[in-house]
Amino acid sequence: MKDNFDRALAEILRHEGGYINDPHDPGGETNMGISKRSYPLEDIKNMTRERAAAIYRRDFWNAIRGDELPAGVDLAAFDAAVNSGPSRAAKWLQRAVAVKADGVVGPNTLAAVQKADPARTINRMLDDRLAWLHGLPTWERYRIGWSRRIGEVRAVGLDMVEAAQVPVEPVAAWWASAPPGAVEWLRRAPG
């Protein structure tokens, strides 16, 4: 969803943390989830939040077309793209909505996503993602963190779906259907 990048980024950064150089991490030196392996020309250790945000928007959010995905689905796809690559994230999204999994979020994928139940899409994507992570040789080392992350992304994503589906009654409609005397009472209320 167009207005969700900042919220989704905050969730990503909460999971990615700051600077680390874990010799067991295939990404090697990372900061805010941006790895030296993927960005060899970046000054990883001194990376700013603004620079990380620009990279995340350009290379991950835009790749999964986050602005065009429903609330919650955008977070699930974005987090998957950051953690496992945009192509793999796109394939999980595509399988969740039963379209050809070619790894590119295009018009067919977007049309299917718009027709699908967003909560079901999130759950299917994250179940598929967790199963894939379970098969990695690094699963035993990172399973607690990965499982926690997916559980938290699921919870936040489903909350975003619910919040987006709550109808907001226009004020004019409320005034028109207000109980007798309520409008006059509000007009006389102090303040």
Briefly describe each language-model feature range.
Residues 1-191:
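Cell-wall polysaccharide-cleaving catalytic domain and substrate-binding groove, primarily
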